[in-house]
């Protein structure tokens, strides 16, 4: 049987992929041209020619050997070097090594901080000085002084209100609420009249922090900070027993709604235990 004769056009068409001619490459001097064929958005066959400039440079031997590694996967049949169909050449980043002398020169050119410039920050007025040297310390800008002034005003108001009524006041309510029998050995119902409950405390609250919070308001006889049994962290509330009832009232007026450790405190009278 004689083999079937085919025309040269059929043989060329059979070599095409999806009816597109193969990619052609040719070099002229230091320029490399790559001609590719593809379909555009309108479905028409177009020819794309890319031009590459050939540059010769000296590289380390390990880099040259790495470029001749055998390729794998979809690029196993590609020639050495990057292939435009599977590889996108990004911008080269060159590493520059700086000597210690150049580094010292660069640091000398940088603007340095003035010798007399202070880097301290005041927590009262946010000035460039230490808080202990703040000129506004002890004024209305100082939060501690503000709490002390509020406590004094609240105590004075409580005394003036009691004197204006002219009514009989029990001995245990005079002089701040627990002048008689207000100590630790007093009856529970007497002590609870000067006890306040502070809630919405953070987990990191300690007895020292609690004492620091209330010691400016007035003397107290007992502090209780509720803690978790397993972790030892604060449960979020505490009880403070003041020596005088007027100090307890001042604590409610001053600390209720006061911001402490990024939380808003809630202070109220302690309810009597059944």
Swiss-Prot record:
Question: Any keyword Ribonucleoprotein?
Answer: no
One GO BP annotation of this record: formation of cytoplasmic translation initiation complex
Highest taxon of the lineage: Eukaryota
Q: Where in the cell is it found?
A: Cytoplasm
One Pfam assignment: RRM_1
Q: Which SMART domains match?
A: RRM
The record, for InterPro entries, names: eIF3_g (IPR017334), eIF3g_N (IPR024675), eIF3G_RRM (IPR034240), Nucleotide-bd_a/b_plait_sf (IPR012677), RBD_domain_sf (IPR035979), RRM_dom (IPR000504)
Q: Which UniProt keywords apply?
A: Cytoplasm, Initiation factor, Protein biosynthesis, RNA-binding
Any one GO MF term held by the record is: RNA binding
PROSITE patterns xref list: RRM (PS50102)
Name the GO cellular-component terms.
eukaryotic 43S preinitiation complex; eukaryotic 48S preinitiation complex; eukaryotic translation initiation factor 3 complex
Q: What is this protein called?
A: Eukaryotic translation initiation factor 3 subunit G-2
Q: What gene is behind this protein?
A: eIF3g2
């Amino acid at each position: 049987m004689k083999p079937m004769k085919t025309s040269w056009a059929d043989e060329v068409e059979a070599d095409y992929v999806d009816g597109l001619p193969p990619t052609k490459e040719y070099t002229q001097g230091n320029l490399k041209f790559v001609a590719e064929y593809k379909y555009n958005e309108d479905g028409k066959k177009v020819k794309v020619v890319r031009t590459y400039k050939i540059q010769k440079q000296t590289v380390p031997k390990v880099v040259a050997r790495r470029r001749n590694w055998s390729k794998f996967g979809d690029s196993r049949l590609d020639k050495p070097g990057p292939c435009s169909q599977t590889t996108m050449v990004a911008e080269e980043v060159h590493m520059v090594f700086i000597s210690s002398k150049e580094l010292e020169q660069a640091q000398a050119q940088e603007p340095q901080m003035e010798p007399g410039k202070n880097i301290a920050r005041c927590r009262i007025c946010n000035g460039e000085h230490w808080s202990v040297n703040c000129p506004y310390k002890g004024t209305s800008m100082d939060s501690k002084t503000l709490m002390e002034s509020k406590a004094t005003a609240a105590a004075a108001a409580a005394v003036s209100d009691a004197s204006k009524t002219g009514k009989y006041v029990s001995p245990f309510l005079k002089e701040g609420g627990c002048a008689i029998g207000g100590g630790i050995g007093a009856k529970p119902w007497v002590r609870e009249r000067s006890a306040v409950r502070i809630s919405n405390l953070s987990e990191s609250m300690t007895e020292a922090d609690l004492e620091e919070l209330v010691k400016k308001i007035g003397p107290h006889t007992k502090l209780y900070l509720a803690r978790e049994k397993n972790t030892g962290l604060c449960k979020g509330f505490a009880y403070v027993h003041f020596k005088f009832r007027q100090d307890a009232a001042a604590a409610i007026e001053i600390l209720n709604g006061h911001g402490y450790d990024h939380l808003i405190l809630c202070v109220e009278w302690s309810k009597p235990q059944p």
